[in-house]
From Swiss-Prot:
<feature type="repeat" description="LRR 6">
    <location>
        <begin position="147"/>
        <end position="170"/>
    </location>
</feature>
<dbReference type="Pfam" id="PF12799">
    <property type="entry name" value="LRR_4"/>
</dbReference>
<dbReference type="InterPro" id="IPR001611">
    <property type="entry name" value="Leu-rich_rpt"/>
</dbReference>
<dbReference type="GO" id="GO:0005737">
    <property type="term" value="C:cytoplasm"/>
</dbReference>
<dbReference type="GO" id="GO:0046600">
    <property type="term" value="P:negative regulation of centriole replication"/>
</dbReference>
<feature type="repeat" description="LRR 4">
    <location>
        <begin position="103"/>
        <end position="126"/>
    </location>
</feature>
<feature type="repeat" description="LRR 9">
    <location>
        <begin position="213"/>
        <end position="236"/>
    </location>
</feature>
<feature type="repeat" description="LRR 5">
    <location>
        <begin position="128"/>
        <end position="146"/>
    </location>
</feature>
<keyword id="KW-0539">Nucleus</keyword>
<feature type="repeat" description="LRR 1">
    <location>
        <begin position="35"/>
        <end position="57"/>
    </location>
</feature>
<comment type="function">
    <text>Regulatory subunit of protein phosphatase 1.</text>
</comment>
<keyword id="KW-0433">Leucine-rich repeat</keyword>
<dbReference type="InterPro" id="IPR003603">
    <property type="entry name" value="U2A'_phosphoprotein32A_C"/>
</dbReference>
<feature type="repeat" description="LRR 12">
    <location>
        <begin position="281"/>
        <end position="304"/>
    </location>
</feature>
<dbReference type="InterPro" id="IPR003591">
    <property type="entry name" value="Leu-rich_rpt_typical-subtyp"/>
</dbReference>
<feature type="repeat" description="LRR 11">
    <location>
        <begin position="257"/>
        <end position="280"/>
    </location>
</feature>
<feature type="repeat" description="LRR 8">
    <location>
        <begin position="191"/>
        <end position="212"/>
    </location>
</feature>
Amino acid sequence: MSNDKSAEVVVLPRENDEESKEPVLKNQFDLSTFDIDSPEIDLTHTRADHIPDLTGFPKIEELRMRNNLLVSISPTISSLVTLTSLDLYENQLTEISHLESLVNLVSLDLSYNRIRQINGLDKLTKLETLYLVSNKIEKIENLEALTQLKLLELGDNRIKKIENIGHLVNLDELFIGKNKIRQLEGVETLQKLSVLSLPGNRIVKIENVEQLNNLKELYLSDQGLQDIHGVEPLTNLLLLDVANNEIKTFSGVERLESLNDFWANDNKVESFSEIEQLSKLKGLQTVYLERNPFYFNDTNQYRRKVMMTLTQVTQIDATTCRKPIE
């Protein structure tokens, strides 16, 4: 059993008080409180600055160490070959290391750290979910071995291009929002994809998605889109988010016969006649259309006019409305 049984007292300066020497506890966990047969060890928010020796827990499958002070992944983790889930969310990690022996890992969360490069994952061939949100990653790379991946989350990084993921043919959900991507590309072979989320990038054209026959949700808000052309082949799409763009026409949306949700608020559509195209979508339930020019033209009648035109809709913007007219 590990010797990590009691908290360690260290002296850290308090903010705005350089003279303070009040002790602050680190590693505030006691492994003796866990059953040796426990499949799950949760050391979240314990001010841990290292991963303790957990060899005394032979059946451990899940390790959670969120919101701690880890600056590196301790070599001690290499012995935890039974792990299927590792969560090191919100620490101070700068690189991915010492994970090679964790060959049974199915889920890995390294979000909210300071990681600059994706690497060290070659042996994790069973991995199905990988979270790398809010790091300092500039390039998608070194994912060649992760062919079983079903969910990849790379939001809030510094990525400029969608690349090196074409082999991830089992991918179901892809999140790369809030990056620096200028072109929608590199996803053509991901035919199992059901969710593609790219909000907050610099995309100006919807393209290279015509092969994504299983796509159900497409998120493209906060870009530079001027129209919606390119979505027409996505006939199984249930949700389309193009809010806060430069869109002037809804032409093309009427082809999305399965659409339930259409989010297009904060765009540049001037004519209310554009709304009439949406009346063809019999399954449409929710629309977000406010703060387009046609909204400001007649704010008092806006909601009523939408209700009269889109009789099938049950929610307009953030407010529900009466049941659709039969």
